[in-house]
Amino acid sequence: MALTRLLIKDFRNIENADLALAPGFNFLVGPNGSGKTSVLEAIYTLGHGRAFRSLQAGRVIRHDQDAFVLHGRIATAEREISVGLTKNRAGDSKVRIDGSDGHKVAELAQMLPMQLITPEGFTLLNGGPKYRRAYIDWGCFHNEPGFFHAWSNLRRLLKQRNAALRQVSRYQQIRAWDQELAPLAEQISQWRAAYSEAIAADISATCAQFLPEFQLSFSFQRGWDKESHYAELLERNFERDRALTYTASGPHKADFRIRAEGTPVEDLLSRGQLKLLMCALRLAQGEFLTRQNGQRCLYLIDDFASELDETRRHLLAARLKATQAQVFVSAIAAEHVFDMTDEKGKMFHVEQGKIAVQPED
């Protein structure tokens, strides 16, 4: 699976772009503020329905315009699929697949699995549990057909329960939510635990290649104590939750803890080592997906040289090439990505929102 063509209209500082893409490496080179990251963000938005630098649609629509339009062509083993996303300033989206409207963003996400590596991506390691939950949930989404529906219902029920906690005085008044919520929580927790266990060996092997100097450990915490059924815990903790006006324990508090020599990685590793660990986690997850269902991820890497010395850049480049996946890399200068280039790759020069293929020397 690869994007063969990308059309961008009125997205960030890009007025119009029509890019024929390489199935391997695609390099975006240009000065800061030129629009390199905007291209990566357009690809990400096409597969997620939202940008990674802003959750507000109005901020990514080009000034004086009412909407952005993204269109792509995806090459599969059987045929090419046309996909499109339009979003206006009110946040209303229209998804089109093979010429038909009425599709969901989740369908795009299934068709375009992506791994994003940015300078801000350290939050996976030093941010709150929600970032590591998102990492595990990405894997569950792509491996468990029922996960997204269950996860969406869980979020809805938790929101309703939290609103009800502000109004009720007795547990019986909230029992109906809990009877629906508890089985979903148990199922989602089981999926997360199974995925965490299944991918652990892949993560460990990749981390051993990237950071052999550390003994790393990974553990999934489901968000409530192991001894309790979630339904029982909700009833037992009702008075506490009512006082807090929110549900204090549950799958929305789960975490995937990562330690080095028994210490949280953010307390021990340098920024360069943290970036390598982040890359290892993303690569391991993408490669695991390929082995599970044959799908290859797209890898989006913003500011490739940031935090990495030459040796580490070589290591990451070699591992990315070994995936045989489609990779999009931004860099300020071509020499930062020189060791990644080959005859199958394509280099684009980006300046002031204009994108042009850079001719080969």
Swiss-Prot record:
One of its GO terms (biological process) is DNA synthesis involved in DNA repair. One of its GO terms (cellular component) is cytoplasm. Disulfide bonds: none annotated. GO terms for molecular function: ATP binding; single-stranded DNA binding. InterPro entries: DNA-binding_RecF (IPR001238), DNA-binding_RecF_CS (IPR018078), P-loop_NTPase (IPR027417), RecF/RecN/SMC_N (IPR003395), RecF_2 (IPR042174). It comes from the Bacteria. ATP binds at residues 30-37. The keyword Cytoplasm applies. Keywords: ATP-binding, Cytoplasm, DNA damage, DNA repair, DNA replication, DNA-binding, Nucleotide-binding, SOS response. It is found in: Cytoplasm. Belongs to the RecF family. This is DNA replication and repair protein RecF. It comes from Erwinia tasmaniensis (strain DSM 17950 / CFBP 7177 / CIP 109463 / NCPPB 4357 / Et1/99).
